[in-house]
């Protein structure tokens, strides 16, 4: 019993399966009760009734399953999850199960059993020992699963439940505020700082040679560029009509606009005096616009078909 980790006052759930001997089961339960101190702290449950018994969650400090040597118990995933549910946080599980050294249906390897225990939510899964399977237990296993191999052995594994309930949650204290960091500036070497310091007195010193910025330019840099050389190549083809780009930046759009305004101004009708549009007070005696209201310069005005020819 010492290797099971039982302690006085701890509640224990003992899971058994057929064909366990009733006398062996009773003797094993009494030995457990002697360690924990009271028979009422030990509960017995048949493996086939485990999922139907509705044990209270987190009610047992230790769960022992399949430890009777005259029986062999295959733990399903549902059974392992139920065992984890009824265990208290920090509780322990000790189970024994027949395993095979090769892949086979009905019986799994020790590695797969360990993975199944972890998937049930238990941690610290450890393989304690491996021993040969008794002939009686092997016969019962063959009858139940139909396994016919000769690589069977009995493995004992221990696991524990985390110190928190499976599915429990807690509030995390996170601070997303900007941390105040104090940066310590390195001390400057006085000699280095003095070398990089320039005062007004240094500028008046005759020993200080200043570079003339104009001396850095050559004759080509001082030439004024020809405006035609600054234009882009668009519209240079004489066979095509000049057309500025949508987002013209070379000045062709402004040039075409000025040419259009000049052509429009040249096409406007001109009078001899240039005052016809101002009204009758400024028109000549033979002006064809006599009697018509004033109009804007360049505005198209239709003359009535009168006796202009007589004038």
From Swiss-Prot:
Residues 219-241 are annotated as: Disordered. Residues 6-170 are annotated as: N-terminal SAM-like domain. Keywords: 2Fe-2S, 4Fe-4S, Apoptosis, Cytoplasm, Iron, Iron-sulfur, Metal-binding, Mitochondrion, Nucleus. GO terms for biological process: apoptotic process; hemopoiesis; iron-sulfur cluster assembly; negative regulation of apoptotic process. Residues 171-222 are annotated as: Linker. [4Fe-4S] cluster binds at residues 273, 276, 284, 287. Residues 273-287 are annotated as: Fe-S binding site B. Disulfide bonds: none annotated. A motif (Cx2C motif 2) lies at residues 284-287. One of its GO terms (molecular function) is 4 iron, 4 sulfur cluster binding. Coiled coil: none annotated. It is found in: Cytoplasm; Nucleus; Mitochondrion intermembrane space. Its cofactor is [2Fe-2S] cluster; [4Fe-4S] cluster. It comes from the Eukaryota. Its main location: cytoplasm. [2Fe-2S] cluster binds at residues 234, 245, 248, 250. One of its GO terms (cellular component) is nucleus. It holds the Pfam family Anamorsin_N. A motif (Cx2C motif 1) lies at residues 273-276. HAMAP family: Anamorsin (MF_03115). The twin Cx2C motifs are involved in the recognition by the mitochondrial CHCHD4/MIA40-GFER/ERV1 disulfide relay system. The formation of 2 disulfide bonds in the Cx2C motifs through dithiol/disulfide exchange reactions effectively traps the protein in the mitochondrial intermembrane space. The C-terminal domain binds 2 Fe-S clusters but is otherwise mostly in an intrinsically disordered conformation. Belongs to the anamorsin family. Component of the cytosolic iron-sulfur (Fe-S) protein assembly (CIA) machinery required for the maturation of extramitochondrial Fe-S proteins. Part of an electron transfer chain functioning in an early step of cytosolic Fe-S biogenesis, facilitating the de novo assembly of a [4Fe-4S] cluster on the scaffold complex NUBP1-NUBP2. Electrons are transferred to CIAPIN1 from NADPH via the FAD- and FMN-containing protein NDOR1. Monomer. Interacts with ndor1. Interacts with chchd4. This is Anamorsin.
């Amino acid at each position: 019993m010492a290797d099971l980790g039982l302690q006085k006052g701890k509640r224990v759930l003992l899971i058994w399966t057929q064909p366990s001997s009733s006398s062996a089961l009773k003797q094993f339960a009494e030995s457990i009760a002697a360690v924990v101190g009271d028979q009422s702290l030990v509960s017995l449950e048949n493996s086939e009734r485990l999922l139907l018994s509705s044990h209270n969650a987190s009610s047992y400090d230790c769960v022992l399953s399949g430890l009777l040597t005259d029986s062999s118990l295959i733990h399903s995933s549902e059974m392992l999850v139920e065992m984890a549910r009824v265990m208290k946080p920090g509780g322990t599980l000790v189970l024994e199960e027949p395993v095979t050294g090769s892949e086979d249906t009905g019986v799994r390897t020790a590695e797969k059993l360990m993975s199944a225990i972890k998937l049930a939510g238990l941690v610290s899964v450890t393989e304690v020992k491996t021993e040969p399977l008794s002939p009686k237990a092997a016969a019962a296993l063959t009858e139940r699963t139909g396994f016919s191999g000769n690589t069977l052995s009995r493995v004992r594994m221990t696991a524990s439940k985390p110190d928190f309930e499976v599915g429990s949650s807690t509030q995390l204290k996170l601070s997303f505020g900007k941390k105040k960091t104090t940066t310590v500036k390195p001390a400057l070497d006085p000699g280095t700082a003095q070398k990089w310091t320039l005062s007004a007195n240094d500028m008046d010193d005759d020993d200080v040679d200043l570079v003339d910025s104009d001396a850095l330019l050559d004759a080509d840099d001082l030439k004024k560029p020809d405006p035609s050389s600054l234009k882009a190549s668009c519209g240079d083809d004489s066979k095509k009509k000049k057309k500025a780009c949508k987002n013209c930046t070379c000045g062709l759009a402004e040039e075409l606009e000025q040419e259009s305004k000049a052509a429009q101004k040249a096409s406007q009708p001109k009078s001899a005096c240039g005052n016809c549009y101002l009204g009758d007070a400024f028109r000549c005696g033979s002006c064809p616009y006599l009697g018509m209201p004033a109009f804007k310069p360049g505005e198209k005005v239709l003359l009535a078909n009168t006796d202009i020819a007589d004038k």
